[in-house]
């Protein structure tokens, strides 16, 4: 008995895990897709236009897209993107890539907060499991690597989760994260989702697991921090831009649900359930496994995760927007619950996840490598023909740097999947490594091919190349002009970013008009079509240059 040591005071058993490998993989996961491509629809052209307006003196409180307020773009995202542009462009990255660093920044912050939440709530080693599960979610890829305000929402939700996780031991830090997360969420996702999560925090003490003094103090501190911060933006907007404040209050203050004068709901639960299957895999099967192994009310983290998921699911069910990225509202608590019983995952289930990941990403990697040779060297011929069909503007381009990245990622993945004694955590690690490999190959080997298909630059360049030199000179000298409709934002943004000709907005005096219409649409009476074009295989979007008949 004299040598007895209480279990809590014993040193943790030594493990052979290497946390630096996790950091290396997350670092590798963060960067593919950030560099070396144009602005891709649907969000990037609009976000970058608002960013340019901010850098040229537009209001920092409201995203300005061609003179119109766009409250879907969080101002804090534009501030961060502008800071990265000032810091990195043009010496370290082009303007587009530098702006995308904002998404990387918020995503990295979100992953870090979720990792700490897992460590605080679940214990040693579980923090990295939460991060690996999130890195394996395909739904997180676009908002993490492209210009998207959803990365701010992810960071805010992760801060809130981390704040909850610290309530039992670090009241001040927990209150700062919880209150700061609420404030950041109100800026990015509106006040309805924020209010629902605040209400969830207030109702948690109804359960005995959350009925302790430190949590009450954390809540008091969170309100002391969060409420003043949440009021700052509406107050400044009301004082400095009253008209914009009224528009925001009535149409966007509640986020996707509209505003006080335009509140909307719709039943879209089937849409979100259908998309959750691929968006949040492997979080949902791992979460389901956890629920079969525990009593929901027995653990603090299970009560929190269940309450959060239930509240967010109700909002998603009545969300009027059918936009899959809103499922990010569920990712942090689902990843937490998925990691809770990961080490207890049965060998058969772990082996299946591992096998499914190896087959899926292995075949995808082989296809991407074969596709790379097909599009650049013409072999296999049938695949080369299909590649040219879907991206006819692509010109074979082999850049040594992306090739080196692709060549590095492939053997690293092969090394990762050859480990023996696969258990739950190793299976999730291999899945995340497979997602990283597939994304890296897609954003290196296929990047020029994708850019030629998704960017408007080839279309704009085709139009300008089709103009007679004399006519182009008349446009440059101001003797002729091209008019474009003020409401045609897509055309205006595309020609501003990639064209050299000036467009006049709603100028009836111009003899030429640039319009957006499907290809092979007949010109209106009194006009002659002198050019038409569209991105490859796009049957809805098209552009045409019309000349007024004499």
Positions of predicted regions on the chain:
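Membrane-integral, polyisoprenol-dependent glycosyltransferases
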Residues: 1-351, 495, 534-542
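Membrane-embedded architecture of ER/inner-membrane glycosylation machinery
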Residues: 2-12, 16, 167-187, 194-195, ...
